[in-house]
Structure formats: C-alpha cells, structure tokens
C-alpha cells in the first residue's frame, strides 16, 4: 500500500473538493483536517460556498395593511423566521449506522444549540462540542418556523406551518414566507406587507416546497387534485406532507374522536390512535393509500416531516411513524397490509426504539 501525504494535495484540487461540500458542518470538518486544507478556504468571500442566510424579520407594520385588527399578533416586534437543520451523525470509523440531531442558532449569542428532533424545544443537557475527527456530521434537511421571540419555541398563530419562498422583484428576487394559520388559511409575508390569500380558501393544514413547487394540502398545485374524501369519509385528521427518496407523501394522523373536518379545526389535541399514508399515483392522477412503508420510517416533526431508512439509524423501527403528542415522543408501528398499528410511548422499556434521538456524545 502506497502512503499518501494528504496535506500536500494541490490547492486546485482542494478548491474543487470544497465546492462539493453541502453544509457548514462539512466545511468545518474539512478545515479541521490540517493547516493546508484550512488555508485553502481562508478567503471567505471567494471560497466559502455557504454564506450566512439572511434572517427574515416580520417588522411591525401598519395594522391597516395586516390581515385584520384581530391578527395583530403577527406584527409584534421581534417575530422572525427561524431556521433549524437536521444532521445525521455517524462514527468516522463506521458509517453504516448513525443518530439524528437537530440544531438552530441562538440569535442573541450566535451559537449553535441542540434541539429535540421532533420539536423546537432545546435539549437541556448536551456536550458543548463534537469532535469532527471522531464523528462525521452530515446535514440532511432544514426546517423553518415563525417565532414571536427568540425565547418562545412555538410557532405563531398565523404561521403554524411555514415555507420560505423567493419573490420575483424586477430582475431579481427577495425573500418571502408562506404559512398556514390555526384557522386553516394561507398567509403571505412579502417582506413588507402581510396578506391573507383568501382566494385559496381555508382548508389547509400543511405546506411544503417540493422540487421547487409549492404544495399545500388539501389541494395539491402540482397535480391539481385533492385527497379523495371517499377514502376517509370526510373525517380528516391532521394532514402532513412527508418527503422521502424524492417522492411526496401525505400522512394523516387519526384522532380518537373523529369528526367532519372544517375550518378552524386543524390543530386539535385529540389522542392519536393511528396513521394512514398516501402517495400520488401520477398515471391515475390521484392519491392512493399505501399499506406499508417498507424499511422507511417517517419522522413527523412540528416544523417539517421526512423519511429515513431504518437500517441506517440506531434503534429505528422500519415501517413506522415517529411523532410527538403533548411533548412526549411516540412511535406508531404500522402492521403490514391490515391497516392496524401499535403505538409506543418512550419509556425505560421502549427506550431502544428512540435511540437515534439520543447520541452517545450528547
């Protein structure tokens, strides 16, 4: 075997490697290898492919230009669009399995902090640093929510679910935010004025930008079709979008107390008894129920949902859905094909099923 001095790689090659990195954490790990690698990224403006994202503040605006006087909560000073990132962490010596962590940045101190993966609540105790030579940290997803203040970790009433968008302005673009309020209406902040998209109606509970297209249930703009009410007989639970392997799914949380879905009835707290999952059949142009998720597990966070491969994450149950209820983490194990499910709340006896959320270094 021929030894290679990795510290003497050509600077041009190092620049090419930097351009292939996809997150700030990857860049920091690259810089930690040795002095020559670190110096190759010293020119921030020229070489740093991850400039800081602009923070979107919902500045106080004239009440006459907001939704209505009753919705003045959204124009409180300090409201802002908060970004969180999800990471897969593996041992550098063995990358076959890993853990999931989530972090955001404290806007007061500028420091990163770890959050509960399924919510926005900070972890109380965790290590102040991670050895990037011992662990490989890869950013896999980001999520956004509108917070009233830096201290408050729950979303504002008008933006229970949020999606940042680019607004065309002349030859350029500026940042805007679409969100769904507790009343099921879609609200829009264009950087200056808050408005309600009344023409869209009031039957929405989630929103997502998927492959560059904005989708919001129950109407899906990409396909121009709604979820077939014949499947659920019009008794809707909490509907969420889930992205997995490039596909878009809808997951319906089934409450114990079923009732006809109506405006203002989207974020109720009835106990969950199961889930149903749907996938778009592009040939039939309709949503169809799927009976099994295979090796996939869906993570239903308060700010975004996505899928992971169970065999790549410690303790993760395949064909299952992880979620929170009254701040408690739970997992719903779907039974293949028969429509039933088993719900487990995290406890000492079931802790291994939630191992992916509690890395050894935390």
Swiss-Prot record:
Q: Name one Pfam family in it.
A: Beta-prop_KIB1-4
- Name which cysteines form disulfide bonds: none
Q: What is this protein called?
A: Uncharacterized protein At1g65760
Organism of origin is Arabidopsis thaliana
């Amino acid at each position: 075997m021929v030894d290679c001095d990795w510290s003497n790689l050509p600077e041009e090659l190092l620049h090419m490697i930097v351009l292939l990195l996809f997150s700030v954490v990857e860049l920091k790990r690259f810089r930690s290898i040795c002095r020559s690698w670190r110096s190759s990224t010293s020119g921030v403006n020229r070489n740093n492919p991850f400039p800081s994202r602009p923070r979107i503040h919902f500045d106080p605006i004239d009440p006459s230009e907001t939704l209505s006087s009753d919705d003045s909560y959204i124009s409180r000073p300090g409201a802002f669009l908060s970004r969180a990132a999800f990471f897969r962490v593996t041992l550098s010596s063995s990358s076959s399995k890993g853990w999931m962590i989530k972090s955001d940045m404290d806007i007061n101190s500028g420091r990163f902090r770890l959050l509960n993966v399924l919510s926005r609540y900070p972890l109380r105790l965790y290590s102040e640093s991670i050895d990037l030579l011992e662990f490989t940290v890869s950013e896999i997803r980001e999520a956004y929510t509108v917070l009233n203040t830096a201290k408050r970790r729950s979303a504002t009433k008008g933006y229970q679910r949020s999606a940042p968008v680019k607004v065309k302005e002349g030859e350029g673009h500026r940042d805007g935010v679409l969100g769904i309020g507790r009343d099921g209406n879609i609200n829009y902040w264009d950087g200056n004025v808050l408005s309600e998209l009344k023409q869209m109606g009031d039957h929405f509970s989630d929103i997502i930008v998927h492959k560059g297209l904005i989708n919001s249930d129950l109407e899906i703009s990409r396909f121009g079709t709604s979820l077939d009410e014949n499947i659920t007989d019009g008794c809707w639970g909490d509907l969420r979008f889930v992205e997995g392997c490039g596909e878009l799914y809808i997951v319906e949380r089934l409450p114990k107390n079923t009732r006809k879905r109506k405006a203002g009835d989207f974020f109720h707290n009835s106990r969950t008894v199961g889930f149903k999952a749907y996938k778009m059949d592009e040939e039939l142009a309709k949503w169809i129920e799927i009976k099994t998720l295979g090796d996939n597990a869906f993570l239903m966070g308060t700010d975004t949902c996505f899928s992971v491969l169970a065999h790549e994450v410690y303790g993760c149950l395949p064909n299952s859905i992880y979620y929170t209820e009254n701040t408690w983490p739970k997992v719903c194990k779907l039974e293949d094909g028969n429509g039933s499910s088993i719900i487990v709340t995290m406890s000492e006896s079931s802790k291994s099923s939630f191992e992916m959320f509690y890395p050894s270094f935390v």
